[in-house]
Amino acid sequence: MYPLMRLFFKLKKLKLLFVVVSHTREATIAAAKSLGITTIELQHGSPARGKLNYDYTSGSKKRTFPDLFLSFGDYWSSNCKFPIDKDKIISFGNPYLYKKINSYSHIVKEDRLVIISQGTPILAKFARDISKQFSKKLTVEYKPHPFEFYEQEPDYFIELRNAGVVISDRHADLYEIFARSRWQVGIFSTALYEGLYFGTACFVVNTIGSEN
């Protein structure tokens, strides 16, 4: 990958390279850096203490970390020790989120509970249990994580539907779902923070990973 990307960048005469989830793009970043191309990471997820891909409190260095990091805001910029100087961490915000908030401001809230899945069995079970108990009072919607659509549909989707749970379409706009929903439940998805911007009350299942 490294030699191919280096050749590609050289031919295209790139000046800037934007990446998301930099720890999955290390060869690409290394190739860019070798040519003096400025590398910039856009925040995806929730950088926090204890997350090995972002927290370098130990003082260790990482040569393939991007030159600049554009965060969603000051909280994220200071939430952990990045392996770059503080002046290279820029609180850029989330313009796309703000645009969506305005786009869906006309939508009226429904008695809808959205489960923000990350493929954890406990959330699928939670969705089934809540739907069975409160099906006459609210709609339970299960928003799958993208990787739950990678291959054939998981077997537990059938169980969810049998319990009356609505499963979001793979192309559904999460922000529109938030705009319609009064409540959201999850464990450690960054989407939970985004849901708050739509006035969607947040509940976190107390299980492994919820501390993040």
Positions of predicted regions on the chain:
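Structural motif
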Residues: V19-H23, S71-D74, I115-T120, K143-F147, ...
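A donor-sugar binding/catalytic signature common to diverse glycosyltransferases
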Residues: H171-N212
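Anion (oxyanion) recognition and catalysis
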Residues: K33-S34, F134-S135, R161, L196
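Conserved catalytic-core segment of nucleotide-activated headgroup transferases in glycan assembly
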Residues: I90-E159
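Short, charged, surface-exposed secondary-structure boundary motifs
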Residues: R49-D55, K99-Y104, E151-E153, I177-F178, ...
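Nucleotide-activated donor-binding/catalytic signature segment of Leloir-type glycosyltransferases, i.e.
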Residues: P154-R170
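Active-site and donor-binding regions of nucleotide-sugar-utilizing enzymes
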Residues: M1-P95
